[in-house]
Amino acid sequence: MFSIWTILRIIFSIIFTVVHIYFTQFINSIEEKKNCPLSTGWRITNGKLISSLFMIIGLINIFLPASKFLSTIPLIGSSYVLLFVIALFSELFIIYRLVDNIGDDENSNCKVKGYNFIINFFSDKDLSQCVFYTIIVSVLFFYL
């Protein structure tokens, strides 16, 4: 019925979508905090936009292998892959910086509850690991 690669693609796309829903909720919870210096600015706006876009891409990829199809078109495919990689790195960088800034004393009003996993995951990471995760997720996304 389905090949193993199709099942893996569907599972990966579901996980990809759920993770980006979680990212969006995390960013929204920071935005809703009163007296939080992090609740406004380019990180919140762009983070919500990028993670919402990735949610839509993940949902589409569950039902149609659109990413695999688009990446094979010569001119459009290379641009799509490059934009995907840049957007994914930007999102991981935004989440990384938000988590890093939440720990500062001046941002003590920005503590969010229910997001310990994301805070613990990104608190001990650095920029090179964001690049590493971007490469891994991009390869999985386009080759599954």
State what each model feature region is.
Residues 1-144:
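Eukaryotic polytopic
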